[in-house]
Amino acid sequence: MMKVLVVVALLVTLISYSSSEGIDDLEADELLSLMANEQTRKECIPKHHECTSNKHGCCRGNFFKYKCQCTTVVTQDGEQTERCFCGTPSHHKAAELVVGFGKKIFG
């Protein structure tokens, strides 16, 4: 019986050592991933900024990613150009309002 306990203890030690090595590798990969996400977060376009040249580069808001909203602008010369900005669509605003109201009621 004592031999079985020694073998089990040895197996548990080996498994915990090998899994800790795997966790260290995983943490290093996660750190690199977080650094990459931070870099893309810095490169995204904030709310109310122009996104005419990069319509899919808007940052994330509290709940949703901002959408590039475009409008046609007529210059003084009579030329029409498209101008876009990152903003929150009305249906996202409504959803955020409902969620905020629900948080106030239910804590």
From Swiss-Prot:
Cell location: Secreted
Propeptide residue range(s): 21-41
Disulphide bonds in the chain: 44-59, 51-68, 58-86, 70-84
Origin superkingdom: Eukaryota
Tissue-wise expression: Expressed by the venom gland.
Species, as recorded: Lycosa singoriensis
Name the UniProt record assigns to this protein: U1-lycotoxin-Ls1n
GO cellular component, one term: extracellular region
Main location: secreted
Record has Metal-binding as a keyword: no
Free-text note on domains in this protein's UniProt record: The presence of a 'disulfide through disulfide knot' structurally defines this protein as a knottin.
